[in-house]
């Protein structure tokens, strides 16, 4: 089976690494000349809206998926005329736009921060008067890793902020005084079978994920699965989806969804019976889903800007290095380390060792 992937970054790369043992081949459509997934399959270098190359991709593969939600929904809709695409264009349309996403949460009875659509500075001023401060202004699309948003803490922060974010459609969200950030990785098959990985505790730095630690018997696991199931059924979803939640007053508020494999699920490569990458491929290919059970105690630490010396990383016991083969650049995810240990005490000790390497 040949899989087409829109995007040739590290997520596409890890999909290919998971799919190759299953006998799958890959083709990546990505405009970047140095797409890091290209070493693992055919690379069609073209813009995501290039219909000639999209048609070429459709003719060459058995199905198409995508590695990030910034791909235009029109691209997926076009491809869907010629080849199966999972997740669907409708799922992408909703997940890539924060207004549609939050409105869906509200319609499904899933708690989420108060939100208001913003189309002008006047809209922003009125929304701030209604929601109050602090609040967070976010672009409706194309925001990731802390980009496309600004926290508004005092009245002076509001002045000119709409223009600062590009005078594009935005969303103002009420600030949530959360006690923690967690995410749930779910996978849904073509026949509706759904499985969930354990909730993950996430730590961010300047909006970029720094550390994910898989939980054991989290008290909010069932609630997270309930909320996530509502979304998956509503979208008739196929593939892996990530759900990000705020922990608030002993419950959960939905922050956002990602219709793809996700950074907070990277630990599953060594830390689960079947990784999120393999399970995504199983789902979209119509194969039986694999077990999402944890193996030991696991965590993932991102390498931002630079990967520490390989010999130092792999010298840490229970540590597994994933180097993306990307050029080092400030603020860029260029690799990660997965830790899988026998117990939580050992895991915490090994996390400290990797963090020390990152700080060098």
What are these regions (language model features)?
Residues 222-243, 248-249, 258-306:
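Active-site "cap" helix and flanking loop/linker of ATP-utilizing ligase/carboxylase catalytic domains
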Residues 114, 134-136, 169-173, 241-242, ...:
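A short linear hydrophobic-aromatic micro-motif
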Residues 186-190, 245-249, 325:
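Short, low-complexity Ser/Thr-rich regulatory SLiMs
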Residues 94-183, 187-234, 355:
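Active-site nucleotide/adenylate-binding loops and adjacent lid/helix of ATP-dependent enzymes
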Residues 1-100, 107, 122:
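ATP-binding N-terminal substructure of ATP-dependent carboxylate-amine bond-forming enzymes
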Residues 282-360:
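Peripheral (often C-terminal) accessory segments that flank ATP-dependent C-N-forming ligase machineries
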């Amino acid at each position: 089976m040949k899989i087409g992937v829109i995007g040739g970054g590290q997520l596409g790369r890890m999909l290919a690494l998971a799919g190759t043992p299953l006998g799958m081949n890959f083709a990546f459509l990505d405009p970047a000349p140095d797409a890091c997934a290209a070493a693992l399959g055919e690379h069609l270098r073209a813009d995501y809206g290039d219909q000639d190359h999209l048609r070429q991709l459709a003719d060459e593969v058995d199905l198409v998926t995508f590695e990030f939600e910034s791909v235009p929904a029109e691209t997926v809709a076009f491809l869907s005329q010629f080849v199966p695409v999972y997740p669907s264009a409708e799922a992408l349309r909703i997940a890539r736009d924060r207004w549609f996403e939050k409105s869906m949460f509200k319609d499904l009875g899933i708690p989420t921060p108060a939100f208001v659509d913003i189309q002008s500075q006047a809209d922003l001023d009125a929304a701030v008067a209604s929601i109050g401060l602090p609040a967070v202004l976010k672009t409706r699309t194309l925001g990731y890793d802390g980009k496309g948003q600004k926290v508004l803490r005092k009245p002076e922060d509001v002045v000119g902020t709409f223009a600062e974010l590009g005078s594009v459609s935005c969303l103002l969200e009420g600030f949530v005084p959360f006690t923690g950030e967690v995410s749930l990785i779910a996978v849904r098959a073509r026949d509706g079978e759904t499985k969930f990985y354990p909730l993950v505790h996430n730590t961010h730095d300047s909006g970029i994920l720094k550390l994910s630690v898989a939980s054991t018997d989290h008290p909010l696991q069932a609630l997270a699965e309930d909320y996530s199931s509502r979304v998956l059924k509503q979208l008739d979803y196929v593939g892996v989806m990530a759900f990000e939640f705020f922990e608030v007053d002993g419950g959960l508020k939905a922050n956002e969804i990602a219709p793809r494999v996700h950074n907070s699920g990277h630990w599953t490569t060594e830390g689960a019976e079947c990784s999120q990458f393999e399970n995504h491929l199983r789902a979209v290919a119509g194969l039986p889903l694999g077990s999402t059970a944890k193996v030991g105690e696991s965590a993932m630490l991102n390498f931002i800007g630079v990967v520490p010396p390989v010999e130092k990383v792999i010298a840490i016991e229970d540590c597994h290095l994933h180097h993306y083969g990307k050029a080092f650049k400030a603020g860029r995810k260029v690799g990660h380390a997965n830790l899988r240990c026998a117990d939580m005490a050992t895991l915490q000790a090994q996390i400290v060792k990797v963090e020390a390497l990152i700080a060098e």
